[in-house]
From Swiss-Prot:
Residues 1-112, 161-191, 294-302, 371-387, 452-472, 522-533 are cytoplasmic. Disulfide bonds join C248-C417. It catalyses: L-leucine(in) = L-leucine(out); L-tyrosine(in) = L-tyrosine(out); L-glutamine(out) = L-glutamine(in); L-asparagine(out) = L-asparagine(in). A motif (CARC motif) lies at residues 437-447. Glycans are attached at N232, N241, N258, N267. Residues 122-127 are annotated as: Important for arginine binding and amino acid transport. This is Neutral amino acid transporter 9. It is found in: Lysosome membrane; Late endosome membrane.
Amino acid sequence: MDSDQTPLINPSLFEECAQNHFAATDPRSRRPFHIEPSYITSINDDDPQRITSVASAMNKRIHYYSKLSNPSDKGLIAPDHVLPAPEEIYVYSPLGTALKIDGSDGTGKNSSIVTIFMIWNTMMGTSILSIPWGIKQAGFTTGVCILFLMGILTLYCCYRVVKSRGTIPLTDTSNWEFPDVCQYYFGSFGRWSSLLFSLVSLIGAMIVYWVLMSNFLFNTGKFIYNYVNDVNVTDDVLSNNGSDKVICPNPDSTRPLNKSMDTYFGNGTNYEQFETWWSKTNTVPFYLVVLLLPLLSFRSPSFFAKFNILGTVSIIYLVSLVTLKAAHLGFHLRFSWNQVQEFFVPEFRLSFPQLTGILTLAFFIHNCIITLLKNNRNQKNNVRDLSIAYLLVGLTYIYVGVAVFASFPSPPLSKQCIQQNFLDNFPSSDILAFVARIFLLFQMMTVYPLLGYLVRVQLLGHIFGDIYPSVFHVLALNIAVVGVGVIMARFYPNIGGIIRFSGAACGLAFVFVYPSLIHMISLHRRGQLKVHSILIHVSIIVLGIANLIAQFFM
């Protein structure tokens, strides 16, 4: 028993090393737990650093037991109580360096700048294409105010999600995600309802992606066909005059048309055949099935994850495109609260809930924010970094939304012509818009399998306990998800409508209801629940419910 209390490192050497433990220039401050004698060399011509026989014996036992079974077998892994404390363990590299392990929870990987950028990059999605349309639906002044207020509200709710794990006493929640917190407070209902709303957000995103990919593939193919065959096509729609052409595809309706309207100059028969086989809603959504259905069946999405940088490149290019177009077109604004005008919209419109639905999804990161912040090097900065990230996201949305809305040439075009995907306001022959569509198309084709993988993990993993139970199960799920996307792209290609419905639905649970309820329950259990807190958080829940209900009346 006395031998168990023997220090692993000779006390005199340990105390001497401890004095210089934080001195980066002292090589002894990076001493590994154990080094084989053949690796021990003199340091600055001093005597070699010797390790006790107890440490040497323990090292040999750990190596011995690790070879008795398969590495995947957990039965013979050394238990925690026989290992040194985390602060005494070093990872020794054959390259000659030793890395100190600060803790066993794996935190402390990324700086604040990296964390902020990760959150910004994760939140920047397809919603940015519909922000100008949402501002048009709400009115310019009202839309900008709603953007600001929704950013603050969703940030507060996200803050409550981050703090939710800390409200659980006497339990190690270091590896918990927000659905685990929901299960703790609401039981199996919390678990399955969080799964349901998470699937709503994922499948909604996949539907939007399918509609947009059909749109981008159609316009890309049309541009290439016209260029290769030297076809001179002018869009037979309302447009402005000038080199930076802006069009109004649907002057009398906010619903996208199922066919393009062009006047062509060339071989009419060939062009008519091309239009028959290359239709935005009748054929192109089905062509995507051949491209994407096999990709959804991959067991691992690691290959597609390598292309995540394309999302950042696409957003930067979109912002640059909007800046360039706005500089050339100039601003066209006229403020009016009540007067109905031919080319402008009122500053306040009753259809503003369409923007709140879009923004709920645009600011939605609540189901994965805990995971993103786990790797923050300084956990004390989580709230600050989250706030900065939300500020940058909000500024990006406001910049794109205001620039597109304000620079839309009115007159001769009405602001009502702003499309749910603002790239549709640029003709297929626009080279800058063509490059943007190419970027977004390729980026979405790499992200779509990742979304499908997440759906598979959450649905099949919960039902069967295996994310790949069989080829038949995976294929059936993929066909169902792809089928929904094809149907929506064929009969309801309105990304603004899809985004606002899915955003209001998943946001009801993850943004408005669960964070507020969990906070009130935790305060009640500690005897700290006050009337003003009840009023604030009940109001947030009511706003979430009203946001969802209002989408059905727009």
